[in-house]
């Protein structure tokens, strides 16, 4: 092949490869917060129970509603109206709850913490100034890795969702009543506050 043609072919090939890479979306990037809504990003990155999947529900109305599946090394992005909400995580009958009070046009984060052998809990990410010892915050040493090593969660198979939802509807009332017996201090640690927004 003519050297000039060979050079032109290599240039075209690299240009095409660059265009393909540029067009490929970055699945670690969180989409913008929808106007008038609050956004909550659930992050999961752990070596504990790494192969186990679990669902996140909203139970604000008193009826479990599946928000999505969150395998390990994934982030589940949820948009909700501003105000008070209750979220549930777990493979019922094992579950835990997170209360949230969120503002419009703000983004919040919560970390999925795996508990051996098959339990999960949700921990709010606090502002740098308000975090207590043992709590996650935007200044926490693990926080950058939680963002970097998690990609956007996909859709859960319908059969899996329906099976787990039936389980949730059966066990939710008793588990929520049990959670209510926690002390105010314990509940506060499991509550995402309006001032915990990013930035």
Segments the model singles out, each with a brief description of its role:
Residues 1-10:
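Bacterial N-terminal signal peptides that target proteins for export
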């Amino acid at each position: 092949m003519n050297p000039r043609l060979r050079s032109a072919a290599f240039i075209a090939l690299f240009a095409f490869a660059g265009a393909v890479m540029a067009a490929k979306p970055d699945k670690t990037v969180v989409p913008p917060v929808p106007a008038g809504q609050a956004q909550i990003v659930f992050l999961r990155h752990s070596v504990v129970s790494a192969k186990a999947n679990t669902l996140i529900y909203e139970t604000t109305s008193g009826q479990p509603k599946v928000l999505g599946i969150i395998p390990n090394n994934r982030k589940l992005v949820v948009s909700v109206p501003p105000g008070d909400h209750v979220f549930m995580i777990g493979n019922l009958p094992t579950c835990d709850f997170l209360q949230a009070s969120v503002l419009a046009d703000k983004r919040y984060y919560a970390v999925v913490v795996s508990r051996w052998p098959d339990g999960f809990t949700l921990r709010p990410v606090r502002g740098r100034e308000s975090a207590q010892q043992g709590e996650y915050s935007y200044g926490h040493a693990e926080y950058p890795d939680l963002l970097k090593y998690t990609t956007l969660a996909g859709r859960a198979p319908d059969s899996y969702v329906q099976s787990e939802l039936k389980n949730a509807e059966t066990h939710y009332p008793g588990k929520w009543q049990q959670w209510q017996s926690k002390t105010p201090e314990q509940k506060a640690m499991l509550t995402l506050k309006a001032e915990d927004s990013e930035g």
